[in-house]
Amino acid sequence: FLWNNHLQGHCPASIQLGLQDPKTGGIYSIMTFGKSRFDKNIEYELLRFCNLRYHNVRGAASKLLKAFERAYKPQSLVSYANRDWSQGNLYRALDFTFIRSTPPNYFYVDSKLKTISRIQTQKHKLKAFLESKNLVFKEELSERDNMIGNGYRIYYDTGNLVYYKNYKRQFNDTNN
């Protein structure tokens, strides 16, 4: 579903919630969550949300987030909106708090215009990555210089918007 309907495609998620059409059983919206990847002080991360392509499902994000909140009773939740295509309107509508903008991220593109994540090319992974493609790895070069020397181009996006939701007070108040 995510590969076909989300701009960034699929990413691993331990929690996947969806809205189904009661008549057809088809999925119209999905929201995925996992443990926070970058900040271990935050319990969960909202990883992906999307509707079926060419469909606008009114209230879907709110319904899926409420289902997650009821089932998992999170203490904190973070999400990242790519600034290339989001202004963060959904997060504001879901009562998230804007925390900050991140610096631009980078990625590589090969001669066939395939995008390569910077995560795949971290220095400790780079030798295996390049050798798996029958390319040359030079220990004395940086990640960037190794990639460019092997014909990749580097591109930058505009970074992310970081949104946060704190539930500690909300759930503690309802438990008393």
Give a label for each model feature.
Residues 169-176:
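Intrinsically disordered, low-complexity and often Lys/Arg-enriched segments
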Residues 1-106, 113-116, 146-169:
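A conserved beta-strand-loop-helix scaffold within acyl/acetyltransferase catalytic domains
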Residues 101-146:
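Short, hydrophobic/π-rich interface segment
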